[in-house]
Curated annotation (Swiss-Prot):
Signal peptide: none annotated. This is Branchpoint-bridging protein. Residues 1-141, 178-199 are annotated as: Disordered. It comes from Cryptococcus neoformans var. neoformans serotype D (strain JEC21 / ATCC MYA-565). SMART domains: KH, ZnF_C2HC. CDD domains: KH-I_BBP.
Length: 546
């Protein structure tokens, strides 16, 4: 085998001829292959210009990409980037670590970003993570002095309610005293739109909203405890805070239904509908918001926060139940107006009737018949049926519509005509009686009370009072002559009375007593003048009462 004369390159077995200049001579390290490249240190491994730590402990299996795998550069990882994984690690083979596919979590790289805590209420990030539980925190335990801790099985429902009310009241009082009124982050409701007062201060901050909610709940619980438990004594500051009466707001959907006049339906004619709802519920209703006051007019009180709010009804009362009753009445009016056509709304129809009655223009058309179809409930111009010309024909015999007198079924019945005439006479007699005048007497026209009354004159002998002889008798026992009768003088005097003779009255000397021309008692012929008077009138003289 040929060998070069000078050994300059060396082989895998023989190292290069390098001699140490200082120290003891020793063998150099074994020479590696030309393709060998030294592996960088574990703490300074680089990948695409970015440092990656603990690469050996990471699982290189494929997993779905998420937001944390998003790169900030345009480099893409490929097979060339894994060239360092092909070399043996610490003298072992180049195969990867054998681990189970069920190995989870701890060896994987934590995602970038802030770690989300399971319990949002735990603000201590450095401490151990709190386990979520359905039970409350031990620090929030409520201890009510004097209240039993163990609840027995023989407790009634009322006692359980009172116990729950006392525990909840103590919890609310503790929160209000310590100022811990804001619940944890996971139990908060979405924040509303910021609202400011006239001075630019925000009136609906988170703390103010939750404090007001707790105070309202405390007021309701105290009212409930006072009603259910006679031994309960409200707190001292309750009467002071009771000045803020319970109230509620009912917003009017004017934007959803701009064509409906909710304001008029709630107020009614001259405010009667609003007053009626206040009487039924016992609450006070005030309409506030945009559109409640005409432009250019100011309200008596200053309500800047209400003027900027939407149109609503502010309800205040002494009791929460009255507020709920009033809210139900207002919602009923709003729902009826929004779901019922205007022509079928009975509430609005009654308001129009009341307004016409107040103005004096009401015409009661409900009980009148339609002249076209004969039905109730509408007039002739509102009749849905076609025009019936026979409805305008009135029978003069029976008074019915739709036929003439010659076609009337009761044409030959005399009772119809007699009844019609009797009805006319009775109406005329009643009218004359109301006017204080005596009407013509007709058969059957006398009232039953007058006929059956004691001492009443029978109808057949009823005559005018000036035709009765006893009405002409004077205090002296004589009789006056009837009007326009050519009789003269007093001929008969009453017994025991001084007769008018020639000595007292010389002008009456020629008058005789008991003659036809004189007036005496009926027994002596004094009533003959009445007989002659009635004979001249074509009537028979009635018998004088004795």
């Amino acid at each position: 085998m040929w060998r070069p004369a000078a050994k300059t390159t060396g082989t895998n077995d023989v190292p290069l001829a390098n001699k140490r200049r200082f120290g003891l001579p020793e063998e150099g390290p074994p020479s590696n292959s030309p393709s060998y490249a030294p592996r960088p240190a574990a703490d300074i491994q680089y990948f695409n210009g970015r440092q990656e730590r603990e690469r050996d402990a990471r699982d290189d299996r494929e997993r779905p990409r998420d937001d944390y795998d998003r790169r900030r550069d345009d480099y893409v990882r490929d097979d060339r980037d894994r060239r360092y994984d092909d070399y043996p690690r610490d003298g072992h083979s180049d195969r990867r670590d054998e681990r189970s596919k069920w190995d989870e979590g701890d060896r994987r790289e934590a995602p970038r970003g802030r770690e989300r805590s399971r319990d949002r209420g735990d603000s201590n990030e450095d401490g151990p993570r709190k386990r979520r539980s359905r039970w409350g925190d031990a620090s929030a335990k409520v201890n009510v002095p004097g209240m039993p801790v163990a609840v027995m099985g023989n407790v009634s429902q009322t006692e359980l309610d009172n116990y729950a009310i006392h525990v909840r009241l103590e919890e609310i009082n503790r929160k209000l005293r310590t100022g811990d009124v804001v619940p944890p982050e996971g139990q908060r409701s979405p924040s509303p739109t910021p609202q400011y007062d006239a001075y630019g201060r925000r009136t609906n901050t988170r703390e103010l909203r939750y404090r007001k909610k707790l105070e309202d709940e405390r007021t309701r619980l105290i009212d409930r405890a006072v009603k259910s438990d006679p031994n309960f004594r409200p707190p001292v500051d309750f009467q002071h805070k009771r000045g803020s009466r319970p109230q509620d707001k009912v917003y009017i959907p004017v934007k959803e239904f701009p064509e409906i006049n909710f304001f008029g339906l709630l107020v009614g004619p001259r405010g009667n509908s609003l007053k009626k709802m206040e009487r039924e519920s016992g609450a006070k209703i005030s309409i506030r918001g945009k559109g409640s006051v005409k432009e250019g007019k100011g309200r008596a009180g200053n309500f800047p926060q209400d003027e900027e709010d939407e149109l609503h009804c502010l309800i205040t009362a002494d009791d929460e139940s009255k507020v709920k009753t009033c809210v139900a009445l207002i919602n009923k009016v709003i729902e009826t107006a929004a779901s019922t056509p205007e022509g079928e709304n009975d509430h609005k129809r009654n308001q129009l009737r009341e307004l016409a009655s107040l103005n004096g223009t009401l015409r009661d058309d409900e009980n009148q018949l339609c002249q076209n179809c004969g039905e109730k409930g509408h007039r002739r111009w509102e009749c849905p049926q076609q025009r019936v010309y026979s409805a305008n024909v009135i029978c003069r015999i029976c008074g019915g519509a739709g036929h003439m007198a010659r076609d009337c079924r009761g044409r030959g019945d005399p009772s119809l005509t007699q009844n019609k005439q009797t009805a006319f006479d009775s109406e005329y007699t009643a009218l004359m009686a109301e006017l204080g005048e005596g009407g013509g007497s007709t058969p059957g026209s006398a009232p039953a009370a007058a006929i059956g009354a004691p001492g009443a004159i029978p109808p057949q002998s009823r005559v005018p009072p000036w035709r009765l002889p006893e009405n002409w008798q004077t205090n002296s026992g004589g009789f006056r002559g009837p009007p326009n009768f050519q009789a003269q003088g007093y001929q008969q005097a009453a017994p025991g009375a001084a007769a008018y003779g020639q000595q007292a009255y010389p002008g009456y000397a020629g008058y005789q007593t008991g003659a036809v021309s004189g007036y005496g008692s009926p027994a002596t012929g004094g009533a003959d003048a009445y007989a002659a008077y009635y004979a001249s009138m074509g009537q028979q003289a009635p018998a004088a009462a004795v």
